[in-house]
Amino acid sequence: MHHRTDTEESAVFKPLAVAVGLGCAVLSLGANAYQYGEYAGETLERLITDYPGRYRGTASFAGASELMQSRLGFGYQTSRQDFTWAGNRSSQNVIASAPGSSGKFLVLGAHYDTYYGRPTLQGLDDNASGAAVLTEIARNLGGIALENGLEVVGFGAEEEGLRGSRAYVESLDASQRANLLGMINLDSLVTGDKMYAHASSNSVSNPALGAYREQILRIARELDIPLFTNPGLNAEYPAGTGCCSDGESFNGMDIPVLFIEATNWELGDLDGYEQTDNPAIPGGSTWHDPAEDNKEVLTNALGQERIEQRMRDFSRLLTRLVLELTNADLLASTASGGALARQMEDQLQRQHQALTRLHDRRWLTLLGSNRPVGSFDGEVGAEGEVSPDSGFDMPGDPESRRAGVHLLGDYRYSEALTLGGSLAFQRSRDKLDHGGRIEGDTWQLGLFGLYNDGGPEWLAGELNLGHTRYDSKRSVYLQAAGGPVLLDQRLSGDTSAWSWGARLEGGYDFSFGELRSGPLAGLDYMRYRIDDFREDEALRTALGYEKQDYDSLEASLGWRLRGELALGARMRLQPYASLRWVRELADGRLEDMDLTSRGDGRVRVADMGGVDKDFGRAQLGAQLAITEQLGVFAEANSRFAHSEGNQASYSLGVNWQF
């Protein structure tokens, strides 16, 4: 904690060294998993135990600098910034940088030095606590995609007049100043009775600069963490504002500055300098006092839980705030929303494939029948299908389940031509990561025909129309590498979809006794449209989805095997199998789409991945006619040699002929 001074002196920026911190990733994350507050607790323990008396010119400060650079290294480029003042006084800042895609950046800072000239001062509260939480926030966000960059700075020489933060600000060029979004300062987080967040004094004339304060107070309410702001009981310190630490160096930049501290603004002179009314802390403060600002005294006075609680709660609050200020949460939400939209498209295509397989089975039945011209036959049936999340040649899509019922009938128009229609209802459910899901209720209407005069050639076709009502829930989930869950939100929405198209397929069957086998070729055109919609929750990560409109035109070439075997008790078995190569000639699906974030109203593009337009499909199944009316079937289908997995499915069904 810095006490006010009027001295202003120049600082010189001398870069010392640059190191890439991603090397820390080689450590076993599983073996070093941590929860909120634990990484900060480790940093704090090292600073106070190994490096008391952390002020310029000492081996202790040099060792603390090495420690801070190491602790800030995961996922960041780290460097040292040397600076001097008053001619012969020097210190340094430790800087860890993670760029964002926007070119703009946020500064998160805390000083790690202790009061000058007191070699036994542990400085647990002032300011090993702030420096420790600083390292944990950086660690939590290490490796996470950021839209706005993050610069984490451990300041030196704060206790000698904010020297490190002033040197940092003076080193910024015009471009950096233009792209600096704001600054968050952490100082003295343990001794004080209450946790506080204040805006800088520049927010008095420009209330918009108090935005970070209001944002973290809202987060505190969401997380149920007691957090306060200066009540304004002392006229020299307007309500909601703070002072007297490195954040002051950023006051003149017309950006939001947030002061994070623990004290008690309702004691003493009502200026925040009296931290506590705990009788075990004589005078109500521990700043700069080697006899009080140490682990033994603070643990005895406040309990070990106080230190752990402050490390944990400040980490939770500030990690969430920095996630939001860097828009890391919105980038993660956009990626999650793109995955949801991609899965909706996939489910819509699988619903169409279920109808085509229904018609395929009917055509197999018709090819094996000898019905008189003018006859009408019908069928009512039910089926269930499961698609596991693993399959034959590579991992599959998310687990999905489908149940359906259908009604169909066809008329034998001539010796060669049969015409029919179908009506089907399907209920589908796809499991998504972290408790998400997509549920679809689909009605499909089909018209189909088969041309076969009893010879080896056959030709079949269909027209179809479908409507789906979607209900969705997705997760926005972010977890630190080897650390705590940073964000876990559920967002729900609903929309409608339409599909329509036509299919033509033909082949030639060679006879091998009771078996028929031969080539087949097909062309399947579909138009898909999923209506635009907005998610229901009033969360900043909620999204608006544009309409998804795309075409699919699949050309297929393959080989089919079918047979008919008479069993006892008048039962008949129809086994069948096919193997096809498929070429997508149109869109197939969308590769990206626009999503609008509720948090800032901006449109971001979700990358849904390239479309694999060459792949295979395999099928193996059998229909069993138990009686003239009752039949069952079992079927396995798989997409294979596809960049997105095999998409295997297994179906069972029953039908009644009339």
Regions found by a protein language model. Name each.
Residues 28, 34-63, 69, 113, ...:
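N-terminal capping segment at the start of a domain
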Residues 43-99:
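A non-catalytic alpha/beta surface segment that caps or lines the substrate-entry region
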Residues 102, 371-374, 411-415, 451-455, ...:
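Outer-membrane beta-barrel strand-turn architecture
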Residues 119-208:
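Acidic/histidine-rich catalytic neighborhood of metal-dependent amide-processing enzymes
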Residues 194-328:
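Active-site-adjacent substrate-binding region
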Residues 339-512, 636-637, 642-649, 653-657:
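Outer membrane beta-barrel translocator domains of Type V secretion systems
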Residues 392-400, 431-438, 469-494, 529-551, ...:
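Solvent-exposed, glycine/polar-rich loop segments of beta-barrel outer-membrane systems
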Residues 545-658:
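Outer membrane beta-barrel transmembrane domains
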